[in-house]
Structure formats: C-alpha cells, structure tokens
Amino acid sequence: MLCHITRPDSVVLEVEVDPKANGEDILNKICQKMGIIEVDYFGLQFTGTKGESLWMNLRNRICQEVDCVSPCRLRLRVKFFVEPHLILQEQTRHLFLMHVKEEIIKGSLRLDAEQAIELCALLAQAEFGDYKQNTAKYCYSQIYGQDPSHDTINTISLKHKSLEGVSQASAEYQALQLVSSLTYYGVEWHFARDSEGQQLLIGVGQEGLFVCKSDFTPIERLMYPVIQMATQSGRNVYVTITKDNGDSVVLLFKFVSPSAANGLYRAITEIHAFYRCDTVMSTVKMQYSRDFKGHLASLFLNESIDLGKRYIFDIQRTSKEVYDRTRRALFNAGVSVNGRGISRSLLRQTKVDREERMCVDCRETHVLKEKLQRLQEALTCALCCEQEISAAFCPCGHMFCCYNCASQLQCCPVCRSEVDRVQHVYLPTCASLLGLAEAKTTNSVLRRTGISEDCANKENARQM
C-alpha cells in the first residue's frame, strides 16, 4: 500500500507499507527517513468524511483507521508540543516550527505587532541566512494578517541585520522560544456546538480546556483539576466539571460526526496523560473495543486474542518518558546532549565508525562498560535521577525511586495504586557493582595493554 505523507512545510514523502500493518509503521518509516528519534511527539492526520481533521490511531491497523485506497494521503503533524529546550534534535525542532507557522497563518496562534516583527526576522534568518537586500523576503502579512507598512519593513530589515552570523538552528530555536510564550501554544482545537447550537472552538492544552467562540474569543477555561470525567455518545461529548461551590455541572458539546466527537474525547485523555502523568496508566493504554467477529472469537476461543481488537487511545509514553528515552538513545550512541540537533543516521554512523576503529579486545571492554552503565541507570531513582533506588511501595511492591522521593508520593507511579507505606530496601549499590566488575576485568585489561597500545597507534596513524 502506497502512502503519501505531507509535512508541515508542504514537502510530500512516499512510503510503502502493508495495509494490515499498524499506523506506527508509517510514522516510523517517515521519521527514519528524516533522521528523527523523537517519534512520540508526532502523529498522522487525515480528513474525515465530513471534512473534519482526525488523528490516526497509530496502535491500530491502517485498514481500521482509513480506507485502503492507494495512495493513502496523510499529514505529518506535531501531536504533542513541548518546550523548545526539551527538544534534542534539530530536525524535530524544524518540524515544530513549520507546524507552528502553519497554526499562525490559520489564526489559532496570534502575535502582537512587535512579536510578528521579531518572528519575521528570525524566520528570514533561518531560511535565507544573513541579510541581503536583493534576496530578503518576509512573511509579515501571512503571520500578522495585515500588509506591512514601509516603516514595518524597515524595522524587520534592521532586526534581520542584527542577526548576522546566527545559524539556522539557532534562529529556529529562538523563533520557537518566542512562539512557545503564546497562550495557545500547543493547544489542539476542535470545532463544535453547544446545547443551543452556538458555534464553538474547544481547545485541549497542557493545563486544561479552552472554550472559545469561532473567532478564538475566550469564553471559559476549564483546568484539569475541575474536570471530573469526559464521556462520548455518538456525536456528543459530555464533560462533567466541579464548580466553585462544589456542584457538578455537565457541559454538552455537539460535533458533525461521531469521529469528530471521538477526537475530542481522545484528546482530553491523551493530552492529560502525556503532560501531567508520570507514566501512562494501564487502564488508558490497554482500553480497547472489538468488532463483531473479534467479539465472537474472544467468547469461544481466547479472551486475549487480538482478532478485531481496536485500541481506544493512542498514547504509550508521557513527556518525561519520551525525553528520558531520547537522551538514553543519544547516550548509547556516544553523543553528548547539548541541545543541538543530531540526525539518527549520523548517530548510527558515529557508533559504527567508533566500533570499526576498535580492536576485538577493546570492543569487548567497551561493551562491558556499556552494560555497566545501563545497570547503573536501572538502579537509579527515576524521579530525581541522582540517588539509587532504595524504597518499595506497599502493598504493590514496585521499586521505582529512592526513599526520599518515595516518601513524598501518595500513589505508585507504575500501577497508580494507593501507597499504604514505604518500605526501605537494600539493593546492591552501583558503586559495589562497578567495583566488582572492575576487579574482574583488571587482569584482563592488564593482559591487553600491549594490544590496546597497538590499537591506539593505529588510530593515531589514521588521524595523521
């Protein structure tokens, strides 16, 4: 099955997949082509039968989400926006900025005149480099909605000149920092109507829900702590909230199709889990429905059979887990994380080149050091990332963090069950494990000294 994927900058990529494969196979192939490791921030959108924009559930089969028509046309977009300093790859940052620019042009992100001038200069520096009178182009009218005056053009030009020498990556980072300060940065918008038929825009963000008029004029803001639950029934979504006086109120939002209603229902759960939870709860991750054939098979064959299974939510990691996972991938590739973007192919090539330069004995030592490092990471507190794991939650028994961090938690970050008490545990310390390993390898290292010197001499000869 052929798939055409459109990026935010209108570049179309082509991949071929099995129609019975999961949607994540498409995303993984696209991100691999672009050298992106931070896959979890992105998703694939398609247009529904009523013209609504919908997210493909990447955990389900492609044929369950869209019509198996070749070529399948999808859009690569940022699903979960994070702060610019949390983005570790330049390629990821570039796609973030392109998506943000698209949102500004559509009107869902609004800048004042001063911000628009600064953003125009940064975008020009990122796209065209240092200021040149004959080639300088600015997108002020696109992002601000008004044609610039002569004075405005001069101001943008002066701002652009002041950025001389700034690299493309740095200009994109500064532009993304500017946009991330806006109120609606990272908010996902859904078109709906209230119980009286008035057109609304429902925005789902990191802190809660924004209820706005069709022109983005705010009506009400619902923070996550006041939202009791959200349910979907057909084309309607019901959001139960708690008022200041303690009373519960149910808000009704109507949509053009059940798929659009399901989009808001999914967004509330997925965005809340991604930004505000330590880990995705199993009740969210494993929630699914079955078609008629799958239901019959589960009754007569096996309850755990995958036939006809369709996951409700498309969320597998939280923002903290994605960031930590990316750092580990960069670390395992032997690359220090300093906020600069590094392509996946470059990481892989760096690791291969390093391994090829090693002799067999040196490679064994390097592999052992990597294993020790992974062991040390596994025994380190997942919350503070400084102390060693020294506590177990009772009654669930999970060991996740140090005693100081565990004593401040009321529920287990792994299974979300309530914590009755925290039990002090004594695991082998990282220092003792590393000392033991060093003792075991000392004789081996001494015997290999001559070989290692030869390896080093060969390396120096190559560099010369």
From Swiss-Prot:
Zinc finger (RING-type): 381-416
GO CC terms, sorted: cytoplasm; cytoskeleton; cytosol
CDD domains: FERM_B-lobe (cd14473), FERM_C_MYLIP_IDOL (cd13195), FERM_F1_MYLIP (cd17104), RING-HC_MYLIP (cd16523)
Gene3D superfamilies in alphabetical order: 1.20.80.10, Phosphatidylinositol 3-kinase Catalytic Subunit, Chain A, domain 1 (3.10.20.90), Pleckstrin-homology domain (PH domain)/Phosphotyrosine-binding domain (PTB) (2.30.29.30), Zinc/RING finger domain, C3HC4 (zinc finger) (3.30.40.10)
Assigned keywords, A-Z: Cytoplasm, Developmental protein, Gastrulation, Metal-binding, Transferase, Ubl conjugation pathway, Zinc, Zinc-finger
SUPFAM superfamilies: PH domain-like, RING/U-box, Second domain of FERM, Ubiquitin-like
Primary location class: cytoplasm
Catalytic activity: S-ubiquitinyl-[E2 ubiquitin-conjugating enzyme]-L-cysteine + [acceptor protein]-L-lysine = [E2 ubiquitin-conjugating enzyme]-L-cysteine + N(6)-ubiquitinyl-[acceptor protein]-L-lysine
UniProt key word Transferase: yes
Pfam families xref list: FERM_M, FERM_N, zf-C3HC4_3
Protein's UniProt keywords contain Cytoplasm: yes
Single GO MF annotation: zinc ion binding
Pathway(s) of this molecule: Protein modification; protein ubiquitination
E.C. numbers: 2.3.2.27
Group of enzyme by EC: transferase
GO BP terms, alphabetized: gastrulation; negative regulation of Wnt signaling pathway; protein ubiquitination; ubiquitin-dependent protein catabolic process
Compartments, record wording: Cytoplasm, Cytosol
Every FERM domain range: 1-279
Role according to the record: E3 ubiquitin-protein ligase that mediates ubiquitination and subsequent proteasomal degradation of myosin regulatory light chain (MRLC). Regulates cell movements during gastrulation by acting downstream of fz7 to antagonize the frizzled-signaling pathway.
Assembly and binders: Interacts with anxa5.
Record protein name field: E3 ubiquitin-protein ligase MYLIP-B
Gene responsible for this protein: mylipb
